[in-house]
From Swiss-Prot:
<keyword id="KW-0446">Lipid-binding</keyword>
<feature type="region of interest" description="Domain I, interacts with DnaA modulators">
    <location>
        <begin position="1"/>
        <end position="83"/>
    </location>
</feature>
<dbReference type="InterPro" id="IPR013159">
    <property type="entry name" value="DnaA_C"/>
</dbReference>
<dbReference type="GO" id="GO:0006270">
    <property type="term" value="P:DNA replication initiation"/>
</dbReference>
<dbReference type="Pfam" id="PF00308">
    <property type="entry name" value="Bac_DnaA"/>
</dbReference>
<dbReference type="InterPro" id="IPR055199">
    <property type="entry name" value="Hda_lid"/>
</dbReference>
<dbReference type="Pfam" id="PF22688">
    <property type="entry name" value="Hda_lid"/>
</dbReference>
<dbReference type="InterPro" id="IPR024633">
    <property type="entry name" value="DnaA_N_dom"/>
</dbReference>
<comment type="similarity">
    <text>Belongs to the DnaA family.</text>
</comment>
<comment type="function">
    <text>Plays an essential role in the initiation and regulation of chromosomal replication. ATP-DnaA binds to the origin of replication (oriC) to initiate formation of the DNA replication initiation complex once per cell cycle. Binds the DnaA box (a 9 base pair repeat at the origin) and separates the double-stranded (ds)DNA. Forms a right-handed helical filament on oriC DNA; dsDNA binds to the exterior of the filament while single-stranded (ss)DNA is stabiized in the filament's interior.</text>
</comment>
<dbReference type="Pfam" id="PF08299">
    <property type="entry name" value="Bac_DnaA_C"/>
</dbReference>
<feature type="binding site">
    <location>
        <position position="169"/>
    </location>
    <ligand>
        <name>ATP</name>
    </ligand>
</feature>
<dbReference type="InterPro" id="IPR027417">
    <property type="entry name" value="P-loop_NTPase"/>
</dbReference>
<dbReference type="InterPro" id="IPR020591">
    <property type="entry name" value="Chromosome_initiator_DnaA-like"/>
</dbReference>
<keyword id="KW-0238">DNA-binding</keyword>
<protein>
    <recommendedName>
        <fullName>Chromosomal replication initiator protein DnaA</fullName>
    </recommendedName>
</protein>
<dbReference type="InterPro" id="IPR018312">
    <property type="entry name" value="Chromosome_initiator_DnaA_CS"/>
</dbReference>
Length: 461
């Protein structure tokens, strides 16, 4: 059977879709064509449902256009393609190889080597208590969690490298350890190295001092998965970047998994060599955003349950509405509430929480105000605050105004009418429309999603 129908679809979709969307949703699909039925196999139910929801119409259109003389029936399934003659894999050319075709080539397994001295991690230092099961999933981290899960199931083949970025305390480190635990669950003898980027720097410095660079290289290039947190700390360390560049290449050539995290998008990391930043984007790059209200409530309820505390819904919502910046802050606040309750023997009510977190809540209220949001958005988009309050409707002003309204709804306790009044006396329906519009744009447009995340980080810092 001719496999060109799916290859033609892939070529068009790769041109039409942003690289991140193509890598996340289309590239993992495997195709089998039998008796005019094209079956696309997704690696899991999450990917299958997403492709059906977002891309099935376009795929059918392409099949109709390209195969008008030989119509194909499209169906989906979860799993791997059968190993039969008429199967076909996705093999579009990577946009970012830069002519280095060998980067993704199959390589023979690296020979086992002696590990360096005790300053180098041993078999693994993955934290067993950070798993996918206790990672609270929401819209803000759904894609990153799904990609990390796929990597754990298929290390070295699904999204390599995986680059996860976002503000402090949003769950990036949790996902790194969850991947490590997932890999070890399937392959107990796998060699997993997790570390903060500064540990890599320290290991290299010690290796240089002890004339042990060869041992250092052997260890880091023999791991099955290298998980490095806060890669932005490589900035300005040219010797470290040079060594990591070669380590990175060696791992990918050997189909060994690399996962990196950062507090910002790869191209925004100053002080890191451009060729490294380019390689960071070779696989899949995903953001973790501050958790939305429902996820914050779920995190609080889960944490309370782990502490054998029955946290009432109204109390969880009260805390979640007042503390919005990150998971770490939420958990720290809850620990403080629980400790106060244990010391005093009092029940955890809204009044008790208000008392226990008095200084924290007061600080939060001072930090995020509509005035502060307007000033921050105006500076970010290089417009005047007066423009946000004006009746001007051109996009260069209207879009920042909508974003500022959406941020005001998310980050303050003001009502829609109050927000509208603060933006030049607008009606509450205008604010509601702005919030819905920005939500839609964040799902569809990478630039808007980036802008919104950057603004939240600025306002929450």
């Amino acid at each position: 059977m001719d496999h060109s129908p799916w290859q033609r679809c892939l070529s068009v979709l790769q041109e039409e879709l942003p690289a991140q969307q193509f890598s996340m949703w289309i590239r993992p699909l495997q195709c089998v064509i039998n008796d005019n039925v094209m079956t696309l196999y997704a690696p899991n139910r999450f990917v299958l449902d997403w492709v059906r929801d977002k891309y099935v119409n376009r795929i059918n259109e392409l099949l109709t256009i390209n195969e008008s003389n030989n119509p194909l029936l499209l169906r989906f399934d979860v799993g791997s393609k059968p190993t039969i003659d008429n199967s076909v894999t996705n093999s579009p050319v990577s946009r970012n190889t830069g002519g280095n075709e060998s980067l993704f080539a199959k390589a023979t397994s690296a020979p086992k080597v002696a590990e360096p001295e005790s300053n180098i991690p041993k078999k693994t230092n993955v934290r067993l208590n950070y798993t996918f099961e206790n990672f609270v999933e929401g819209k803000s981290n759904q894609l990153a969690r799904a990609a990390a899960s796929q990597v754990a199931d298929n290390p070295g083949t699904a999204y390599n490298p995986l680059f996860i970025y976002g503000g402090t305390g949003l769950g990036k480190t949790h996902l790194l350890h969850a991947v490590g635990n997932g890999i070890l669950l399937n392959k107990p003898n796998a060699k997993i190295a997790y570390m903060h980027s500064e540990r890599f720097v320290q290991d290299m410095v010690r290796a240089l001092q002890n004339n042990a660079m060869e041992k250092f290289k052997q260890y880091y290039r023999s791991v099955d998965a290298l998980l490095i947190d806060d890669i932005q700390f490589f900035a300005g360390k040219e010797r470290t970047q040079e060594e990591f560049f070669h380590t990175f290449n060696a791992l990918l050539e050997g189909n060994q998994q690399v996962i990196l995290t950062s507090d910002r998008y790869p191209k925004e990391i100053n002080g890191v060599d451009d060729r490294l930043k380019s390689r960071f984007g070779w696989g899949l790059t995903l953001a973790i955003e501050p958790p939305e209200l429902e996820t914050r409530v779920a995190i609080l309820k889960r944490k309370a349950q782990e502490s054998q505390i029955n946290l009432a819904d109204e109390v969880a919502f009260f805390i979640a509405k007042r503390l919005r910046s990150n998971v770490r802050e939420l958990e720290g606040a809850l620990n403080r509430v629980i400790a106060n309750a244990n010391f005093t023997g009092r029940a955890i009510t809204i009044d008790f929480v208000r008392e226990a977190l008095r200084d924290l809540l007061a600080l939060q209220d001072k930090l995020v105000t509509i005035d502060n949001i307007q000033r921050t958005v105006a500076e970010y988009y290089k417009i005047k605050i007066a423009d946000l309050l004006s009746k001007r409707r051109n996009r260069s002003v209207a879009r920042p105004r909508q974003i500022a309204m959406a941020l005001s709804k998310e980050l303050t306790n003001h009502s829609l009418p109050e927000i509208g009044d603060a933006f030049g006396g607008r009606d509450h329906t205008t604010v509601l429309h702005a919030c819905r519009k920005v939500k839609s744009l964040r799902e569809e447009t990478h630039d808007i999603k980036e802008d919104y995340s950057n603004l939240i980080r600025t306002l929450s810092s």
